[in-house]
Amino acid sequence: LEVSIDEQPFSPIVTPSLENMSELFSDKDADLIVFGHNHTVHMYDDKETIYFNPGSVGLNNGAYASYGLVTINENEFSIERVKVPYDNEEFIAGFDEKQVPAKSLIFDQFL
C-alpha cells in the first residue's frame, strides 16, 4: 500500500476511464491501483497497470454489496469481483428515519 485516502484526502475526482486513470496515476509505477469514490465497479488495463474499483458495499444501482478480493502471490496477483445480494429496503428507509441531509441528491446519484 503506497498511499491511503487519509494521507491524501483531497485527490482529484475524475470520471473513471482508462485515459483518466492513466493520467491521474501517471506518477505511479504499479501493477495494480485500487481506487474508489465512484460506486460502480470499474476495471481498466493498459497492459502495464490494472486500475480496479470494486464498487460500493451499499449505495449502488442494485440490491447488492459489491467488493473485491485481491490475492497477491510471489510474482502475480488475481482479482475477484464479488456481489452479495441483500434486502436494501430497510437501508433505504433508514435515510428517512435518520433525516439524512441531501437524501434526494444521494439517491439520484447512486440508486
List the model feature ranges, each with a label:
Residues 31-37, 51-55:
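Active-site neighborhood of phospho(di)ester-bond hydrolases with catalytic His/Asp-centered motifs
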Residues 41-43:
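Residue-level recognition of beta-strand microenvironments
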